[in-house]
Amino acid sequence: MSDITVANYHAFPDARGHFGRYGGRFVAETLIGPLQELAQAYDAARHDPDFIAAYNKDLKDYVGRPSPIYHAERLSRKVGGAQILLKREDLNHTGAHKINNTIGQALLAARMGKTRIIAETGAGQHGVASATVAARLGLECVVYMGATDIERQQINVYRMKLLGATVVPVTSGSATLKDALNEAMRDWVTHVGHTFYIIGTVAGPDPYPRMVRDFNAIVGREARAQMIEDYGRLPDAMTACVGGGSNAIGLFHAFLNDASVRIYGAEAAGDGIATGRHAASIVAGRPGVLHGNRTYVICDDDGQILETHSVSAGLDYPGVGPEHAFLADSGRVQYVGIRDEEALAAFHLLAHTEGILAALESSHAVAHAMTLARDLPKDALVLCNLSGRGDKDVHTIAAREGVRV
Protein backbone atom coordinates (compact mmCIF):
# COMPACT_ATOMS: atom_id res chain seq x y z
CA MET A 1 0.00 0.00 0.00
CA SER A 2 1.29 3.48 -0.83
CA ASP A 3 1.93 6.27 1.66
CA ILE A 4 -0.97 8.72 1.28
CA THR A 5 -1.83 11.62 3.57
CA VAL A 6 -5.49 12.65 3.49
CA ALA A 7 -6.82 15.70 5.34
CA ASN A 8 -10.49 15.19 4.47
CA TYR A 9 -11.85 11.90 3.20
CA HIS A 10 -15.15 13.54 2.31
CA ALA A 11 -13.42 15.57 -0.42
CA PHE A 12 -13.38 12.58 -2.77
CA PRO A 13 -13.94 11.86 -5.58
CA ASP A 14 -12.49 14.77 -7.52
CA ALA A 15 -14.28 16.47 -10.41
CA ARG A 16 -13.21 13.66 -12.78
CA GLY A 17 -14.58 10.93 -10.56
CA HIS A 18 -11.21 9.81 -9.19
CA PHE A 19 -10.42 8.61 -5.68
CA GLY A 20 -6.69 9.20 -5.81
CA ARG A 21 -5.49 6.97 -8.64
CA TYR A 22 -8.68 4.90 -8.68
CA GLY A 23 -12.11 5.36 -10.24
CA GLY A 24 -12.66 7.31 -13.46
CA ARG A 25 -14.50 6.32 -16.64
CA PHE A 26 -12.80 3.53 -18.58
CA VAL A 27 -15.62 2.80 -21.01
CA ALA A 28 -16.39 2.60 -24.72
CA GLU A 29 -17.05 5.92 -26.45
CA THR A 30 -20.73 4.98 -26.84
CA LEU A 31 -21.16 5.20 -23.05
CA ILE A 32 -19.45 8.55 -22.48
CA GLY A 33 -22.55 10.54 -23.46
CA PRO A 34 -24.99 8.52 -21.32
CA LEU A 35 -22.62 8.72 -18.33
CA GLN A 36 -22.30 12.48 -18.71
CA GLU A 37 -26.09 12.77 -18.93
CA LEU A 38 -26.45 10.64 -15.80
CA ALA A 39 -23.83 12.65 -13.89
CA GLN A 40 -25.50 15.94 -14.79
CA ALA A 41 -28.93 14.61 -13.81
CA TYR A 42 -27.64 13.24 -10.51
CA ASP A 43 -25.77 16.43 -9.62
CA ALA A 44 -28.91 18.46 -10.29
CA ALA A 45 -31.10 16.07 -8.28
CA ARG A 46 -28.85 15.91 -5.22
CA HIS A 47 -29.02 19.69 -4.91
CA ASP A 48 -32.81 19.79 -5.41
CA PRO A 49 -34.66 20.04 -2.05
CA ASP A 50 -37.77 18.44 -3.57
CA PHE A 51 -35.82 15.38 -4.77
CA ILE A 52 -34.08 15.01 -1.40
CA ALA A 53 -37.41 15.36 0.42
CA ALA A 54 -39.01 12.66 -1.76
CA TYR A 55 -36.04 10.34 -1.18
CA ASN A 56 -36.07 10.86 2.59
CA LYS A 57 -39.84 10.33 2.73
CA ASP A 58 -39.49 7.00 0.93
CA LEU A 59 -36.70 5.94 3.29
CA LYS A 60 -38.99 6.60 6.24
CA ASP A 61 -42.39 5.48 4.96
CA TYR A 62 -41.47 2.75 2.44
CA VAL A 63 -38.12 1.34 3.59
CA GLY A 64 -38.88 1.73 7.30
CA ARG A 65 -35.84 3.75 8.34
CA PRO A 66 -34.15 4.42 10.63
CA SER A 67 -32.82 0.91 11.20
CA PRO A 68 -31.87 0.31 14.85
CA ILE A 69 -28.54 -0.46 16.44
CA TYR A 70 -28.96 -3.66 18.45
CA HIS A 71 -26.68 -4.69 21.32
CA ALA A 72 -25.95 -8.38 20.78
CA GLU A 73 -25.47 -9.08 24.48
CA ARG A 74 -25.52 -12.88 24.43
CA LEU A 75 -23.20 -13.02 21.42
CA SER A 76 -20.86 -10.57 23.17
CA ARG A 77 -20.78 -12.71 26.32
CA LYS A 78 -20.20 -15.88 24.31
CA VAL A 79 -17.31 -14.36 22.35
CA GLY A 80 -15.78 -12.48 25.29
CA GLY A 81 -14.20 -9.06 25.21
CA ALA A 82 -15.89 -6.02 23.68
CA GLN A 83 -19.59 -5.38 23.20
CA ILE A 84 -20.84 -6.20 19.69
CA LEU A 85 -23.43 -3.84 18.23
CA LEU A 86 -25.36 -4.63 15.05
CA LYS A 87 -26.64 -2.01 12.62
CA ARG A 88 -29.82 -3.81 11.55
CA GLU A 89 -30.04 -3.22 7.79
CA ASP A 90 -31.65 -6.67 7.60
CA LEU A 91 -34.83 -5.08 8.97
CA ASN A 92 -35.32 -2.83 5.94
CA HIS A 93 -38.10 -3.51 3.44
CA THR A 94 -36.81 -6.31 1.12
CA GLY A 95 -34.37 -7.45 3.82
CA ALA A 96 -31.10 -5.67 3.07
CA HIS A 97 -29.35 -2.34 2.60
CA LYS A 98 -29.79 -2.51 -1.18
CA ILE A 99 -33.10 -0.64 -1.22
CA ASN A 100 -31.44 2.52 0.14
CA ASN A 101 -29.76 2.82 -3.25
CA THR A 102 -32.49 1.51 -5.55
CA ILE A 103 -35.03 3.97 -4.13
CA GLY A 104 -32.70 6.85 -4.96
CA GLN A 105 -31.77 5.64 -8.44
CA ALA A 106 -35.38 4.78 -9.35
CA LEU A 107 -36.52 8.27 -8.36
CA LEU A 108 -33.71 9.64 -10.52
CA ALA A 109 -34.77 7.40 -13.43
CA ALA A 110 -38.33 8.71 -13.21
CA ARG A 111 -37.03 12.29 -13.01
CA MET A 112 -35.04 11.66 -16.23
CA GLY A 113 -38.10 10.28 -18.01
CA LYS A 114 -36.80 6.71 -18.30
CA THR A 115 -39.45 3.98 -18.55
CA ARG A 116 -37.29 0.87 -18.16
CA ILE A 117 -34.73 -0.07 -15.53
CA ILE A 118 -32.16 -2.82 -15.66
CA ALA A 119 -29.98 -4.23 -12.91
CA GLU A 120 -27.39 -6.88 -12.22
CA THR A 121 -27.54 -9.06 -9.14
CA GLY A 122 -25.48 -11.71 -7.38
CA ALA A 123 -27.21 -12.76 -4.17
CA GLY A 124 -30.47 -11.47 -5.59
CA GLN A 125 -31.01 -8.76 -2.98
CA HIS A 126 -30.22 -5.93 -5.38
CA GLY A 127 -32.43 -7.57 -7.99
CA VAL A 128 -35.29 -7.81 -5.52
CA ALA A 129 -34.79 -4.21 -4.41
CA SER A 130 -34.71 -3.03 -8.04
CA ALA A 131 -37.85 -5.01 -8.92
CA THR A 132 -39.54 -3.61 -5.82
CA VAL A 133 -38.99 0.05 -6.68
CA ALA A 134 -39.80 -0.59 -10.34
CA ALA A 135 -43.17 -2.02 -9.34
CA ARG A 136 -43.84 0.93 -7.08
CA LEU A 137 -43.06 3.48 -9.80
CA GLY A 138 -44.62 1.54 -12.68
CA LEU A 139 -41.36 0.94 -14.55
CA GLU A 140 -40.40 -2.10 -16.63
CA CYS A 141 -37.63 -4.07 -14.91
CA VAL A 142 -35.08 -6.54 -16.32
CA VAL A 143 -32.55 -8.19 -13.99
CA TYR A 144 -29.40 -9.96 -15.21
CA MET A 145 -28.22 -12.78 -12.96
CA GLY A 146 -25.51 -15.40 -13.38
CA ALA A 147 -26.81 -18.94 -13.90
CA THR A 148 -24.66 -20.15 -10.99
CA ASP A 149 -26.23 -17.56 -8.71
CA ILE A 150 -29.73 -18.41 -9.95
CA GLU A 151 -29.17 -21.98 -8.76
CA ARG A 152 -28.10 -20.93 -5.27
CA GLN A 153 -30.58 -18.06 -4.88
CA GLN A 154 -33.82 -19.48 -6.28
CA ILE A 155 -35.97 -17.86 -3.60
CA ASN A 156 -34.84 -14.39 -4.62
CA VAL A 157 -35.29 -15.26 -8.31
CA TYR A 158 -38.92 -16.11 -7.62
CA ARG A 159 -39.35 -12.97 -5.52
CA MET A 160 -38.19 -10.86 -8.47
CA LYS A 161 -40.66 -12.58 -10.78
CA LEU A 162 -43.48 -12.10 -8.28
CA LEU A 163 -42.67 -8.38 -8.35
CA GLY A 164 -43.05 -8.32 -12.12
CA ALA A 165 -39.41 -8.35 -13.19
CA THR A 166 -37.91 -10.39 -16.01
CA VAL A 167 -34.87 -12.37 -14.83
CA VAL A 168 -32.31 -13.06 -17.57
CA PRO A 169 -29.86 -15.94 -16.86
CA VAL A 170 -26.24 -15.23 -17.79
CA THR A 171 -24.22 -18.31 -18.75
CA SER A 172 -20.97 -16.71 -19.94
CA GLY A 173 -17.73 -16.82 -17.94
CA SER A 174 -18.20 -18.07 -14.39
CA ALA A 175 -21.95 -17.26 -14.64
CA THR A 176 -21.80 -15.07 -11.52
CA LEU A 177 -22.01 -11.37 -10.63
CA LYS A 178 -19.15 -10.19 -12.87
CA ASP A 179 -20.80 -11.72 -15.92
CA ALA A 180 -24.24 -10.38 -15.01
CA LEU A 181 -22.76 -6.89 -14.84
CA ASN A 182 -21.18 -7.35 -18.27
CA GLU A 183 -24.53 -8.28 -19.81
CA ALA A 184 -26.35 -5.40 -18.11
CA MET A 185 -23.77 -2.97 -19.54
CA ARG A 186 -24.39 -4.37 -23.04
CA ASP A 187 -28.14 -3.92 -22.61
CA TRP A 188 -27.69 -0.32 -21.46
CA VAL A 189 -25.57 0.61 -24.48
CA THR A 190 -28.26 -0.77 -26.79
CA HIS A 191 -31.31 0.77 -25.09
CA VAL A 192 -29.91 3.89 -23.42
CA GLY A 193 -32.65 6.16 -24.77
CA HIS A 194 -35.37 4.81 -22.47
CA THR A 195 -33.37 2.62 -20.05
CA PHE A 196 -31.80 3.47 -16.69
CA TYR A 197 -29.14 1.11 -15.34
CA ILE A 198 -29.33 0.75 -11.56
CA ILE A 199 -25.88 -0.54 -10.56
CA GLY A 200 -26.06 -2.17 -7.16
CA THR A 201 -22.61 -1.51 -5.79
CA VAL A 202 -20.03 1.28 -5.52
CA ALA A 203 -18.21 0.10 -8.65
CA GLY A 204 -18.56 0.95 -12.32
CA PRO A 205 -17.67 4.20 -14.10
CA ASP A 206 -18.28 7.62 -12.56
CA PRO A 207 -20.84 8.74 -11.35
CA TYR A 208 -21.90 5.30 -10.07
CA PRO A 209 -19.36 4.87 -7.22
CA ARG A 210 -20.23 8.23 -5.66
CA MET A 211 -23.94 8.02 -6.43
CA VAL A 212 -24.38 4.56 -4.87
CA ARG A 213 -22.26 5.66 -1.90
CA ASP A 214 -24.37 8.77 -1.38
CA PHE A 215 -27.62 6.81 -1.44
CA ASN A 216 -26.23 4.31 1.10
CA ALA A 217 -24.59 6.94 3.32
CA ILE A 218 -27.80 7.18 5.33
CA VAL A 219 -26.59 4.02 7.11
CA GLY A 220 -23.51 5.73 8.55
CA ARG A 221 -25.23 9.03 9.29
CA GLU A 222 -27.90 7.22 11.28
CA ALA A 223 -25.35 5.03 13.05
CA ARG A 224 -23.20 8.00 14.06
CA ALA A 225 -26.17 9.83 15.58
CA GLN A 226 -27.44 6.64 17.26
CA MET A 227 -24.06 5.88 18.83
CA ILE A 228 -23.84 9.37 20.32
CA GLU A 229 -27.45 9.29 21.55
CA ASP A 230 -27.43 5.74 22.95
CA TYR A 231 -23.82 5.34 24.09
CA GLY A 232 -22.53 8.89 24.37
CA ARG A 233 -19.60 8.20 22.07
CA LEU A 234 -18.47 6.71 18.79
CA PRO A 235 -17.56 3.01 18.47
CA ASP A 236 -13.98 1.93 19.02
CA ALA A 237 -14.07 -0.20 15.88
CA MET A 238 -16.45 -1.09 13.08
CA THR A 239 -16.65 -3.66 10.34
CA ALA A 240 -18.74 -4.52 7.29
CA CYS A 241 -18.49 -7.10 4.54
CA VAL A 242 -16.95 -6.03 1.24
CA GLY A 243 -17.71 -7.45 -2.19
CA GLY A 244 -18.19 -4.42 -4.38
CA GLY A 245 -18.56 -2.62 -1.08
CA SER A 246 -21.82 -0.65 -1.04
CA ASN A 247 -22.99 -1.54 2.46
CA ALA A 248 -19.50 -0.99 3.82
CA ILE A 249 -18.96 2.45 2.33
CA GLY A 250 -22.49 3.35 3.40
CA LEU A 251 -21.52 2.70 7.02
CA PHE A 252 -17.89 3.87 6.87
CA HIS A 253 -18.34 7.21 5.12
CA ALA A 254 -19.72 9.15 8.09
CA PHE A 255 -16.79 7.97 10.25
CA LEU A 256 -13.84 8.33 7.86
CA ASN A 257 -12.66 11.61 9.39
CA ASP A 258 -12.98 10.25 12.95
CA ALA A 259 -9.44 9.05 13.61
CA SER A 260 -10.43 7.35 16.87
CA VAL A 261 -12.63 4.82 15.04
CA ARG A 262 -10.79 1.81 13.63
CA ILE A 263 -12.46 0.61 10.42
CA TYR A 264 -12.27 -2.86 8.87
CA GLY A 265 -13.62 -4.34 5.65
CA ALA A 266 -14.25 -8.10 5.61
CA GLU A 267 -13.59 -9.63 2.18
CA ALA A 268 -14.42 -13.17 1.09
CA ALA A 269 -11.37 -15.42 1.51
CA GLY A 270 -13.40 -18.41 0.29
CA ASP A 271 -11.48 -21.64 0.76
CA GLY A 272 -8.41 -19.63 1.83
CA ILE A 273 -6.25 -17.06 0.05
CA ALA A 274 -3.48 -19.60 -0.60
CA THR A 275 -5.88 -21.90 -2.49
CA GLY A 276 -6.70 -19.27 -5.10
CA ARG A 277 -10.41 -19.95 -4.51
CA HIS A 278 -11.46 -16.63 -2.99
CA ALA A 279 -12.88 -13.20 -3.83
CA ALA A 280 -10.59 -10.97 -1.76
CA SER A 281 -9.76 -8.23 -4.28
CA ILE A 282 -7.86 -5.93 -1.91
CA VAL A 283 -6.24 -8.56 0.31
CA ALA A 284 -4.98 -10.64 -2.63
CA GLY A 285 -5.53 -8.57 -5.78
CA ARG A 286 -3.70 -5.83 -7.65
CA PRO A 287 -4.63 -2.54 -9.36
CA GLY A 288 -6.36 -2.93 -12.72
CA VAL A 289 -9.44 -1.89 -14.68
CA LEU A 290 -12.80 -3.64 -14.38
CA HIS A 291 -16.30 -2.54 -15.35
CA GLY A 292 -15.31 0.99 -16.20
CA ASN A 293 -13.14 1.95 -13.24
CA ARG A 294 -9.59 1.50 -11.99
CA THR A 295 -9.53 -0.41 -8.74
CA TYR A 296 -8.14 -3.57 -7.13
CA VAL A 297 -8.98 -6.68 -9.13
CA ILE A 298 -8.23 -10.39 -9.02
CA CYS A 299 -6.26 -11.09 -12.17
CA ASP A 300 -3.27 -12.96 -13.58
CA ASP A 301 0.10 -11.47 -14.56
CA ASP A 302 -1.32 -10.46 -17.94
CA GLY A 303 -4.21 -8.57 -16.36
CA GLN A 304 -6.84 -11.17 -17.26
CA ILE A 305 -9.64 -11.37 -14.70
CA LEU A 306 -9.66 -14.67 -12.81
CA GLU A 307 -12.66 -16.64 -11.59
CA THR A 308 -13.52 -16.13 -7.94
CA HIS A 309 -15.17 -18.18 -5.23
CA SER A 310 -17.23 -17.44 -2.14
CA VAL A 311 -19.99 -19.30 -0.36
CA SER A 312 -21.73 -15.93 -0.53
CA ALA A 313 -23.06 -14.99 -3.98
CA GLY A 314 -23.03 -11.29 -3.12
CA LEU A 315 -19.28 -11.27 -2.40
CA ASP A 316 -18.34 -13.46 -5.38
CA TYR A 317 -16.89 -10.60 -7.47
CA PRO A 318 -13.30 -10.07 -8.74
CA GLY A 319 -13.19 -6.33 -8.04
CA VAL A 320 -14.09 -3.74 -5.44
CA GLY A 321 -15.36 -0.16 -5.46
CA PRO A 322 -12.61 2.38 -6.23
CA GLU A 323 -13.18 4.29 -2.99
CA HIS A 324 -12.32 1.13 -1.07
CA ALA A 325 -9.13 0.78 -3.10
CA PHE A 326 -8.24 4.35 -2.17
CA LEU A 327 -9.08 3.80 1.51
CA ALA A 328 -6.88 0.70 1.53
CA ASP A 329 -3.93 2.55 0.02
CA SER A 330 -4.36 5.46 2.43
CA GLY A 331 -4.38 3.07 5.38
CA ARG A 332 -7.64 4.50 6.73
CA VAL A 333 -9.45 1.17 6.36
CA GLN A 334 -7.89 -2.25 6.91
CA TYR A 335 -9.20 -5.11 4.80
CA VAL A 336 -9.09 -8.72 5.96
CA GLY A 337 -10.07 -12.04 4.43
CA ILE A 338 -12.77 -14.18 6.06
CA ARG A 339 -12.98 -17.83 4.96
CA ASP A 340 -16.24 -19.58 4.12
CA GLU A 341 -15.99 -21.73 7.23
CA GLU A 342 -15.52 -18.67 9.47
CA ALA A 343 -18.57 -16.96 7.98
CA LEU A 344 -20.67 -20.10 8.40
CA ALA A 345 -19.58 -20.46 12.02
CA ALA A 346 -20.55 -16.83 12.66
CA PHE A 347 -23.91 -17.40 10.96
CA HIS A 348 -24.71 -20.28 13.31
CA LEU A 349 -23.43 -18.57 16.46
CA LEU A 350 -25.47 -15.42 15.81
CA ALA A 351 -28.56 -17.53 15.15
CA HIS A 352 -28.11 -19.54 18.35
CA THR A 353 -27.28 -16.61 20.64
CA GLU A 354 -29.49 -13.82 19.27
CA GLY A 355 -32.18 -15.46 17.14
CA ILE A 356 -31.00 -13.61 14.03
CA LEU A 357 -30.36 -15.27 10.66
CA ALA A 358 -27.78 -13.06 8.95
CA ALA A 359 -27.07 -13.14 5.24
CA LEU A 360 -23.92 -15.06 4.36
CA GLU A 361 -22.43 -11.78 3.14
CA SER A 362 -23.11 -10.13 6.50
CA SER A 363 -21.82 -13.21 8.32
CA HIS A 364 -18.33 -12.37 7.06
CA ALA A 365 -18.58 -9.08 8.96
CA VAL A 366 -20.00 -10.79 12.04
CA ALA A 367 -17.03 -13.18 12.00
CA HIS A 368 -14.58 -10.28 11.99
CA ALA A 369 -16.54 -8.40 14.64
CA MET A 370 -16.09 -11.45 16.86
CA THR A 371 -12.34 -11.45 16.20
CA LEU A 372 -12.09 -7.74 17.02
CA ALA A 373 -14.17 -8.13 20.19
CA ARG A 374 -11.92 -10.86 21.60
CA ASP A 375 -8.91 -8.53 21.53
CA LEU A 376 -10.63 -5.53 23.12
CA PRO A 377 -11.69 -4.77 26.72
CA LYS A 378 -15.23 -5.42 27.89
CA ASP A 379 -16.24 -1.75 27.76
CA ALA A 380 -15.11 -1.31 24.14
CA LEU A 381 -17.75 -1.05 21.40
CA VAL A 382 -17.57 -2.86 18.06
CA LEU A 383 -20.16 -1.84 15.47
CA CYS A 384 -20.98 -4.39 12.76
CA ASN A 385 -23.15 -3.71 9.73
CA LEU A 386 -25.69 -6.51 9.46
CA SER A 387 -26.31 -5.72 5.81
CA GLY A 388 -29.01 -8.31 5.11
CA ARG A 389 -31.06 -11.21 6.40
CA GLY A 390 -30.23 -14.83 5.73
CA ASP A 391 -33.53 -16.35 4.60
CA LYS A 392 -32.17 -16.45 1.05
CA ASP A 393 -29.19 -18.55 2.16
CA VAL A 394 -30.95 -21.31 4.07
CA HIS A 395 -30.93 -23.71 1.09
CA THR A 396 -27.21 -23.04 0.45
CA ILE A 397 -26.28 -23.69 4.07
CA ALA A 398 -28.48 -26.78 4.30
CA ALA A 399 -26.93 -28.23 1.13
CA ARG A 400 -23.39 -27.67 2.46
CA GLU A 401 -24.34 -29.47 5.65
CA GLY A 402 -26.08 -32.37 3.91
CA VAL A 403 -29.56 -31.37 5.04
CA ARG A 404 -32.49 -31.70 2.63
CA VAL A 405 -35.09 -28.93 2.88
From Swiss-Prot:
List the disulfide bonds in this chain: none
Report the cofactors.
Answer: pyridoxal 5'-phosphate
**What reaction gets catalysed by this protein?**
(1S,2R)-1-C-(indol-3-yl)glycerol 3-phosphate + L-serine = D-glyceraldehyde 3-phosphate + L-tryptophan + H2O
N6-(pyridoxal phosphate)lysine occurs at K98
Q: Which UniProt keywords apply?
A: Amino-acid biosynthesis, Aromatic amino acid biosynthesis, Lyase, Pyridoxal phosphate, Tryptophan biosynthesis
- Give the pathway: Amino-acid biosynthesis; L-tryptophan biosynthesis; L-tryptophan from chorismate: step 5/5
Identify the EC number(s). 4.2.1.20
Top-level taxon of origin: Bacteria
GO MF annotation, one:
tryptophan synthase activity
One Gene Ontology cellular component: cytoplasm
- Classification via Pfam families: PALP
- Stored Gene3D superfamilies: 3.40.50.1100
CDD domains membership? Trp-synth_B
Q: Which InterPro entries match?
A: Trp_synth_b_CS, Trp_synth_beta, Trp_synth_beta/beta-like, TrpB-like_PALP, TrpB-like_PALP_sf
Enzyme group, top EC level?
lyase
- Homology family: Belongs to the TrpB family.
The record ties this protein, via HAMAP family, to: Trp_synth_beta
Complexes and interactors: Tetramer of two alpha and two beta chains.
* Function noted in UniProt: The beta subunit is responsible for the synthesis of L-tryptophan from indole and L-serine.
Identify this protein by name: Tryptophan synthase beta chain
Organism for this UniProt entry: Xylella fastidiosa (strain M12)
Give me the gene this protein comes from.
trpB
